[in-house]
Structures are given as structure tokens and as C-alpha cells.
Amino acid sequence: ADSIAIVTAPWEVVTVENGIVHKRASIPFLYQGAQSINILEINPKAGKKIGIAFTGQLEKISRIARKHQAIGAINGSYFDMTKGNSVCFLKVGSQVVDTTSLDELKLRVTGAVYEKKGKVKLIPWDRQIEKNYKKNKGSVLASGPLMLKDGEYYDWSQCNANFIETKHPRSAICLTEEGKILFVTVDGRSPENAVGINIPELAHLLHVLGGKDALNLDGGGSTALW
């Protein structure tokens, strides 16, 4: 029933520019409640490139995006709400900005966005992989959990059960079987319009949308798509 609700939803589709499409749907009943979903679909074949941007302080995603002259942007990974720094591995070019805390590795960080020359991969992540990537070329942002890998559901059983099972607003990045990149946000904390979803539900949503690889980026009040 949930798969049918996603496929038959009245998606509003707006072409932002060549190679970038914004899709939005309000679905009255999906995963036990109302859902509000936004997707920015990027086609790399149209010459669109992805990059990882960061700021040394707390700033709105819209401001960071404008600084980098981005067409679209999504918030990524977990941060210290007091200091504003990432608590997950963040490497931009040759600069290692932050490393993943042990707490985050235990809680949920099992994947990462790896970007090199505007091309993106979603890869598994752990402490040993992090050590190896400090010297690798390209930019990296660790996050999690990794939800899909090669079209299959990824194992998130070692992650914190409460984080996995609780419905929240969510942000995610997904690479589709067709080679497109999806920035996806699901709103939440609004019982009448958007109840939010948990990780198994988000993984299912992205699988139905044609996802091959998918990574949860963040959630809660930080969820933002620009």
C-alpha cells in the first residue's frame, strides 16, 4: 500500500533549469500518517556537478548556497549545536575540517558522501575507512546510516535503535539506477500535515523512487532543502 501511495501521488514537478527538477508531494496517508516530501532531482549528464560546502560558523543553508552560487542545496550530517562544527568526518579538498566522534560512529555514522571532480559516490564508513580517507583526494562528508547500497537495503542493525525507529523530519541523498542524484527531504513534527518517517521507511521510499545507493544526511529541525 505504501509503495502504491508513493507511485500514484500527485507529484508537482517544476523544471528549475536544464538537468534540475524539483518534485513535491503531500501524501495524506503514507507510513501511518500524512507526509510532505520534496525532491531535487539532478542529472549529471546535463553537466551538473555536486560539491560539499562548509562554513566555520552557524549559518543558514540558503546563505551558504548563495556564497557558492549553487542552484540547489541540502543540509548535511550532524553538528555540534553550540560550536557549529561537524561531529562527523568532513574533508573539503585536501583540508580535513573535522573527524567523526566515537559516539557518532556507534550511534549512526555508517556511510559517507565522496565527491571528486564533481562526481559523487555513496560509500560505507567506519573508523578504519576514515583513517584511510584522510590522505585520499576528493571531498568527503560522513553521515548515516547508509540505507541502500547497490540496490539492496544496507544493515543498520548496529545503529542506535531509537534513532532508527523514531519518526523525524529527514534529509537524504540518493543515487538512482538511472544515474541521477536526488536530494530528498521529508518534513515532520506536524501531525496534520507531516508526521515524519523513520529510517526503514525512508529507505523504502528511496528504493521505490529508483534508488541504488542512499544515505541519511540529517534530520530533526535541521532538515532543509534550498
Regions found by a protein language model. Give the residues of each.
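Gly/Ser/Thr/Pro-rich low-complexity, intrinsically disordered segments
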Residues: 1-226
